[in-house]
Amino acid sequence: MQTVVSGIRPTGNLHLGNYFGAVRAFTQMQHEYNCYFFIADWHSLTTHPHPDDIIRSTNTILAEYLACGIDPEKATIYVQSDVREVLELYLYLNMNAYLGELERTTSFKDKARQQPDNVNAGLLTYPSLMAADILMHKAVKVPVGKDQEQNMEMARKFARRFNTIYGVDFFTEPQSFSLGERALKVPGLDGSGKMGKSEGNAIYLIDDEKTISKKVMRAVTDAGPTEPNSEKPEPIQNLFTLMEIVSTPEVYQHFDGLYNECAIRYGDMKKQLAADINAFCAPIRERILYIQGDKELLARVARLGAEKARESAAKTIDEVRHIIGFRPR
């Protein structure tokens, strides 16, 4: 069975974009692959979050993963900082990484531009840590978006370089894995682009009915079509895309027909869309709240995941130490 690795930074609640873009596919993949899903709390340190925020956000993502259907008996769900072997491999990969290639990565240049007063070494060596996360479990496939493709190429480069330096065929080059039809691009509510964590753009799985309604009713619209069967502007198309994802085909076709007839009332459409989003989120929201209240369950799942992840990681590190020439641990 092939190994798949995917991580998420604990920077807030999961939203509909996270669910339909990745998490829903993870619930299917856990039956087909040897899956490692981790919460990347070490990666979050580049922005210096408060300790309380790290703990809270980590437990939030863990609870939401479980509520969405990721099964700790079928997949390994763990917190990155619980697997200290990752840091050891991170060190070894950094020893083989060159300053110039790290400085040229798009992720580093973008982050340096966004936070010029906090251009730290963690940002520079982000590709090395990401590679350690992946190579630690000898992953064959890694579900990533286009924005991470350069870092995936770096991971492959680090794997090749390690093999070349030590004259071994140890690390397999991991391949980017497109979720294809399993993943849907969910648009944001601000009229353009995909759903993200920016204010007013996202609907979170934990949002209650009132919050969902308020967000949807504020979504950008226009004065309505003036010609039958006219092309939908992006903000309007975004609403229809959301409706296509969460509503029944009959509901979607009803409002699409009204739009094409120049008879649509956006207020009615938004009310229906809000109701359908709430109907989808409600059972997940209830499970999230229940799981968040069960601290023992969260601790047990994290402990189980750490044990399974460290078992895999220990094998890799022991072999890496032997290849490099270090004494056994």
PLM region spans:
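Short connector loops/turns at beta-strand edges and beta->alpha or beta->beta junctions
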Residues: W42, A131-L135, G191, T248
